[in-house]
Amino acid sequence: MVRLKDQKNLSAALYVQQNSLDWNKLPLKDAIKSVKGNGKRQLAVFSDPNCPYCKQLEAELNKLNDVTIYTFIYAIKAQSIAPSKQVFCEADPALAWKNLIAKGTQPTSKKPCANPIERNIELGRSLGLQGTPVVIFSNGFKVNGAVPSTTIENMWRELGL
C-alpha cells in the first residue's frame, strides 16, 4: 500500500513494525559480543550450535565489516545444551563459540560455571522465537533464517541503520 500524497510505502513500514521487538529489552550481557572494525552497526543473533542454518549464517556474518554482533546461544536442541553452557566456561567464550559453530570443536573446559543458557532459552520463548537462526537489527526488526551478508547490508541501508 502506497500513500499517494508522498509515495510512502506503508506496507513496508507495517511489515517492519509487525516483525520487530524492543531492542532495548534484550539482555545483551547474556550474549557473546564480537566486534569487527569500528562496530558501529549492531545485530543480535539467536543461534544453536547444532543448527546447520546457523552455521551458514555464521559464515555470512564473517563477511560483514564495522559491526558488533551479540550472539545469544539459543540451545533449542537437547544435544546443544551441554556444549553451549561450556562455551561460557572457557577463557575466551567468543573464540569458543566461533570454534564450536564453525568447526564443531567442543569446548574443553569441564568445570561448571555461571552461564545464561537457561535465561536465553526463556528469552527466546518469551519473544516467540520458534527456530534458529534469528537475526535482529538494532531497530528491533527481526528476520528468520540464514540471511546472506548482502541482504543484511541492503537491509541496513533500507532501514537507515
Residue ranges and their predicted role:
Residues 91-92, 140:
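Short loop segments at secondary-structure junctions
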Residues 86-90:
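Short, hinge-like loop/turn segments at secondary-structure boundaries
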Residues 94-98:
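Conserved, helical-rich catalytic subdomain that frames metal- and/or nucleotide-binding sites
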Residues 124, 131-144:
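A short, hydrophobic beta-strand/beta-hairpin element that forms part of a small beta-sheet core
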Residues 1-85, 99-102, 106-132, 152-161:
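Extracytoplasmic thiol/disulfide redox context detector
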